[in-house]
């Protein structure tokens, strides 16, 4: 289908359309023959895959990118950039026409180079073309996410320019005269773009350490000012593109504390309960958790290589004495909520990250895992982290478990109360005695429940419950045995069988079956005498 006919079928109202999407007279006098209203409608239509496929085959994207570069300061270039980004997201194959285009270099320089001739000071006039810069950064992020390393841009230079912009925007963010919401949006896009660019470029350790500390500062600030800010998520993703080994031990501990605070702000008890019950909202909640939690858990996993940091992470992530006042399955803290996510299949990737983290903190000792988290969660941790099956949770491990009490003081497991090996909660002597002793009424009630349970299972043909003694009698095994006994035994042995484990009716029947009438008469006399 020709592009003209397809666009007319969409009702976009183009009266005339040339063979190419663009027309050039020369660089000084450009003309573009598509109305901006039509571009906006086409941009919205390209949000659908089928529309994007038709448009992708019809437009010359190399020429379109050149138009965007030449008309950069006009509104039409902004809408064309949005059209290009929408279509590239749906049809990544059009990137082949873009990655080696010189116009891509010019656009990148115009956006990121602060001292470019056409761009004034970033601090004073950034808000004038704020939307234009944000749209281009989103387009570049989509392009780098779908394209390999084969691209005309100098990624090292782009990364340096992006870091300079990040520093200045962070300085601008501290100024009360600026719109914090707009600044936050730009910071979000810069952090989003840092992840794919950092994977394609090299940075000196000194410079990388500085930008690493800056990203950590942005992360901590966003958590304190607005816990729901998207800066939090993009900062954690950006950190994964840097070498965290450049941090000192104190800085690594600080990052782990920020990570735990972030986990606490994300996890909500009510949402975890929705996931456990499988309610209608569970898919949205699962998508939210799978987008936000794995990067934070991946950062904590990468911090494990620091010497002597396991003790600090254990005190942050292991259940506290307050958590153990009830079963860990009912806990409301972020530690208990993460454990509860281990049992929910819809968020299995989160369970894999967290189980691997806990397994590393316990040095792969399955005995210690079972003793800290209980037998149920220990099995889940072993399955998610692909470790060997754990032994009895009652056995002792060599290394102590570091925890914090309600006052925030460090405790080792030897100073704590005993932990229930099943639920992971504390068990006092009173609880132990209550659990071991059952009244006669409770025993009868439990026996009755089991009786009805097996009865229902037998009626449903789930299991076949057969009395083993009755089964032996029906098979004729007892008859054969007692025939041999009566042929060889004495009266004293018959008397002993009668009073021990065999009823008188069975003995009489066996005697009749063997035709030993004199033994029957004598047996009746013995029975009467007894």
UniProtKB/Swiss-Prot annotation:
It is a single-pass membrane protein. Keywords: Chaperone, Guanine-nucleotide releasing factor, Membrane, Transmembrane, Transmembrane helix. Pfam families: Ric8. Chaperone that specifically binds and folds some, but not all, nascent G alpha proteins prior to G protein heterotrimer formation, promoting their stability and activity. Also acts as a guanine nucleotide exchange factor (GEF) for G alpha proteins by stimulating exchange of bound GDP for free GTP. The chain crosses the membrane at residues 492-512. It comes from Schizosaccharomyces pombe (strain 972 / ATCC 24843) (Fission yeast). It comes from the Eukaryota. GO terms for molecular function: G-protein alpha-subunit binding; guanyl-nucleotide exchange factor activity. One of its GO terms (cellular component) is cytoplasm. The keyword Zinc does not apply. This is Synembryn-like chaperone C3E7.04c. Belongs to the synembryn family. It is found in: Membrane.
